[in-house]
Amino acid sequence: MSSQKKKISLFAFFLLTVITITLKTYFSYYVDFSLGVKGLVQNLILLMNPYSLVALVLSVFLFFKGKKAFWFMFIGGFLLTFLLYANVVYFRFFSDFLTFSTLNQVGNVESMGGAVSASFKWYDFVYFIDTLVYLFILIFKTKWLDTKAFSKKFVPVVMAASVALFFLNLAFAETDRPELLTRTFDHKYLVKYLGPYNFTVYDGVKTIENNQQKALASEDDLTKVLNYTKQRQTEPNPEYYGVAKKKNIIKIHLESFQTFLINKKVNGKEVTPFLNKLSSGKQQFTYFPNFFHQTGQGKTSDSEFTMDNSLYGLPQGSAFSLKGDNTYQSLPAILDQKQGYKSDVMHGDYKTFWNRDQVYKHFGIDKFYDATYYDMSDKNVVNLGLKDKIFFKDSANYQAKMKSPFYSHLITLTNHYPFTLDEKDATIEKSNTGDATVDGYIQTARYLDEALEEYINDLKKKGLYDNSVIMIYGDHYGISENHNNAMEKLLGEKITPAKFTDLNRTGFWIKIPGKSGGINNEYAGQVDVMPTILHLAGIDTKNYLMFGTDLFSKGHNQVVPFRNGDFITKDYKYVNGKIYSNKNNELITTQPADFEKNKKQVEKDLEMSDNVLNGDLFRFYKNPDFKKVNPSKYKYETGPKANSKK
């Protein structure tokens, strides 16, 4: 390019950077993010929302002059690109967007190795083509750049136009989704209407507000929550109340398990033959087919948190990571104080993952059997941790030495994304959808099913089965919306938003000594487990703050809230702002009579639970039935096999 030819001005470089970042954002909307965009208004909003913040941020560098102005513009553009791409990779794995809260979980990434790498796609270079071109120009073709300063008097005009565009965007968004910023729990809504960059700013503001909430919280805030939850309490079913008093309680966590696998055949073979038997109602287990996970960004940790506290996880981040130092009145601590239970958690991963080694102390959990208690040599490990069959076998040996009554929680790992399994461990062929995630899920789910059967048989041999309450549950979905096309091939039906909600059934099975099994079709969620167990143990719950209700109570609440503000009842589901019938998943145009009441209850539940966590409200509670847990009395020793990894 000769000196007579027109050079690239700083303003032209600014426009190029804004346009290319916006184009990449559009690309992510339609290729990587599942935002459920419908109609002219939503598509118009999608075209509009990336510009405002990108232009506002980059316009700051128009105040600079010389080559450094171009470099600052380049760095700013690269950081915005990196934010976009980080959200893309995160969304592929979690079907959610990055928040400031999730940055506290960055330590988990190293442990998740292969699962994260599986989230990279061949076409990801698209996100960085412009970055490489700009870098080439800045390093090798500086003569193409017009280093004259941009007229500073026009910079405020550019900034004002960016701000005006944001408010226009917000006006359109409020028209299509009223009270977007005040009553929306779903991050997908926020990104759809605001874009990923404005969402990051919004999340930063909410994070600051939540951090301030603890300092401003008072006993009055606790009283409001107690008054609300006490109105919701239900009477225990006299047929079940106290039937499991001082019985061992074993809780088995099935990683990433979804109940569409129950009675599902692939290539003529049952995927989960053992769980199929437990689900028949003919065994000693009662099966709840309409049991849903209620997790948020914390996924596995959220399921643990919700089931042991009858609280919901946070709208952003993991309660384990962000609120691990709070005061709690958890199920294991109550069982200890009321009936002398000793509690433990068993998991074939290391204790720092999800901040477990700290938060368990605040739950009053006595012992943590982490990876250092198991042989973690290469032959015993797959994907994220210890193979389930080895984990269950060793865990049963530990349990055989425990004094009754104990409360024991076993967390499996093999059926975890990206669902890889050693060939020697596979006993069923993969499905043939062409999607490695979905096809691998079939094999790892079968392996989990076999491991569970071996464990149950082991409990019988060791004399632990008959005297124990045994709970089994799926912690969260395994197959995200990103794999809907493959799921349609596997299930032979269209995966609509309503159908995807149905697929969030993760199942709950419970064996109660002295009770026969069956099938219970009540709609329920993980928040309902704690009050159920307390009533089975014969513990009066009137002074405990819980958002769930007893599964066996005749007054059990069948409105199941999800962390994003959607919900399902026994008759209909509310998904992405629309109501669908449970019978056929068809859209309901006439609003059900109890819809507004249920919607307000869900919003209130989530709001009140968030207040408990953000305000650390249990620190104010003088519960006559509970002595506050002293976390300093708990110490989790390193196990005898700490050096087994090779």
Curated annotation (Swiss-Prot):
Keywords: Cell membrane, Cell wall biogenesis/degradation, Manganese, Membrane, Metal-binding, Secreted, Transferase, Transmembrane, Transmembrane helix. Residues 623-646 are annotated as: Disordered. The record marks A217, S218 as: Cleavage. Residues 623-638 have a biased composition (Basic and acidic residues). Its main location: membrane. Signal peptide: none annotated. Substrate binds at H416. The keyword Ribosomal protein does not apply. The chain crosses the membrane at residues 8-28, 44-64, 69-89, 120-140, 154-174. One of its GO terms (biological process) is lipoteichoic acid biosynthetic process. Pathway: Cell wall biogenesis; lipoteichoic acid biosynthesis. Belongs to the LTA synthase family. This is Lipoteichoic acid synthase. It comes from Staphylococcus aureus (strain bovine RF122 / ET3-1). The gene is ltaS.
